[in-house]
Amino acid sequence: MGLELYLDLLSQPSRAVYIFAKKNGIPFQLRTVDLLKGQHLSEQFSQVNCLKKVPVLKDGSFVLTESTAILIYLSSKYQVADHWYPADLQARAQVHEYLGWHADNIRGTFGVLLWTKVLGPLIGVQVPEEKVERNRNSMVLALQRLEDKFLRDRAFIAGQQVTLADLMSLEELIQPVALGCNLFEGRPQLTAWRERVEAFLGAELCQEAHNPIMSVLGQAAKKTLPVPPPEAHASMMLRIARIP
Ligand SMILES: N[C@@H](CCC(=O)N[C@@H](CS)C(=O)NCC(=O)O)C(=O)O
């Protein structure tokens, strides 16, 4: 069996892995794990990842979780262009500098709107307005720091070329945009960065990867999204309760 990627394109880190593999012509079998249908909770998927999360890479008997580990594995195994994950020590360290900051400040912050606007209501849970407001402020602060500390006068997050950092970042920042919160508005520096990254990746690939999340709000309004099965509700409610 060749390379298998277990993904759901509603998931930010899954999209980063998908886009990376596609952009670099890496052959893989897509194993879609539909989170809304609770497929990640199935016994079958638990055998692949006992953490019950996507993305997951399976390369023969080798199983790897965590999107950044997966991206680094793919970069090295398929010898993709150096700019993604530079061999130069300091350039590579800057990619990790961002990814560390990203895990603390971006991941977990920009996905909240999906819970407040779509997933909570889908299972009948309303997120308190004060949490929504707090999240809005956290996003503004994180964007400011992203611009001031990382982008500065550079074309991309970790320098003058596209790296894994840009891909991870873009996929998180797209999530609120899909839900009607265009956080790029009034931020020319960030908008120019987004345009550069998307131009590099190609409009067609971006559209393909972003389609499911871009249509989620419309589907929620039309009530065509599958309601997650009851066994998924407890973990979803826990996730919502953890929103700071
Ligand atoms: N740090 C992990 C995050 C993985 C993760 O949280 N995946 C989410 C989708 S974005 C998931 O599978 N959630 C299912 C659940 O927690 O029940 C990574 O970057 O791969």
Swiss-Prot record:
Domain of life of the organism encoding this protein: Eukaryota
Organism listed in the record: Rattus norvegicus (Rat)
Substrates-to-products reaction catalysed: RX + glutathione = an S-substituted glutathione + a halide anion + H(+)
Phylogenetic classification of the source organism: Eukaryota, Metazoa, Chordata, Craniata, Vertebrata
Free-text function comment from the UniProt entry: Catalyzes the inactivation of reactive sulfate esters in carcinogenic arylmethanols. Highest activity towards ethacrynic acid and cumene hydroperoxide.
Binding positions (glutathione): 40-41, 53-54, 66-67, 104-107
Cellular component GO terms, alphabetical: cytoplasm; cytosol; nucleus
Claim: Nucleus is one of the keywords in the record: yes
Location(s), subcellular: Cytoplasm, Cytosol; Nucleus
Enzyme class: transferase
One MF annotation (Gene Ontology) recorded for this entry: glutathione peroxidase activity
Subunit structure: Homodimer.
Protein name: Glutathione S-transferase theta-2
Chain ranges of the GST C-terminal domain: 88-230
Enzyme Commission number(s): 2.5.1.18
